[in-house]
A protein has these predicted regions:
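Long, low-complexity, charge-rich intrinsically disordered regions
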Residues: 134, 139-175
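Charged, amphipathic alpha-helical coiled-coil/dimerization segments
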Residues: 62-112
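Short alpha-helical "packing" element that flanks the helix-turn-helix/winged-helix DNA-binding module
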Residues: 25-29
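Short, locally clustered residues in the helix-turn-helix/winged-helix DNA-binding domain
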Residues: 30-37, 97
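Terminal interaction helix/tail motif
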Residues: 95-136, 141
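Canonical helix-turn-helix DNA-binding module
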Residues: 38-80
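N-terminal leader segment of winged-helix/HTH proteins
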Residues: 1-19
Length: 175
């Protein structure tokens, strides 16, 4: 099974090289595009990619030099850094780093079954490595919906509707 997963990962990673990004840069850019506003610090990127802080620091620096991301400093704590995609970064992700049928050409039924099975495998790996799951906000035990309003009870903040489908560092699966 491992060789299949490795081969699929290489096929997906090879597409990033055609756009001038190495696989780590493409993975970091894709993560930042999918992460919520609370999960875009360098340490969050490193934890998600299971990479060293040094590797991620150089990766983020390269993405910033390419004009794909911009550094944001916290108003509350000037030492705290997060990254947002620039317009060029969003355009690149939209065009090349997607789950579109051309990127992943399988039927919906096969994709759903593969997703379910791969999710189970991923959960086992993450548990074995004692790594964070980084799930979607809407699947978190702290995600609350009241009418059209969304709220994170853990961070005590209101959420935009679009944040429900973003990856969160703090996510804890609902029971």
């Amino acid at each position: 099974m491992m060789w299949l997963i490795e081969r699929m990962a290489r096929l997906l990673a090879s597409e990033a090289w055609t756009e001038g990004l190495n696989p780590t840069q493409a993975a970091a850019l894709q993560y930042l595009a999918r992460a919520n506003r609370f999960s875009r610090s360098p340490s969050h990127v490193a934890d998600y990619l299971l990479a060293t802080r040094g590797t991620v620091s150089q990766t983020l620096k390269a993405l910033q030099q390419k004009g794909l991301i911009a550094e944001q400093r916290s108003d509350a704590d000037r030492r705290s850094i997060s990254y947002d995609l620039t317009d060029d970064g969003h355009a690149l992700v939209k065009e090349y780093v997607t789950d579109s049928p051309t990127t992943f050409p399988v039927t919906d039924d096969l994709a759903d079954a593969a997703s379910e099975n791969l999710s189970a495998v991923m959960q086992e790996w993450l548990t074995a490595r004692n790594a964070r799951p980084f799930g979607l906000c809407r699947n978190c035990q702290y995600h609350q919906v009241s009418g059209k309003k969304r709220h994170c009870a853990l961070l005590a903040v209101d959420l935009a509707p679009s944040e429900a489908d973003k990856i969160c560092f703090e996510q804890q699966a609902a029971p």
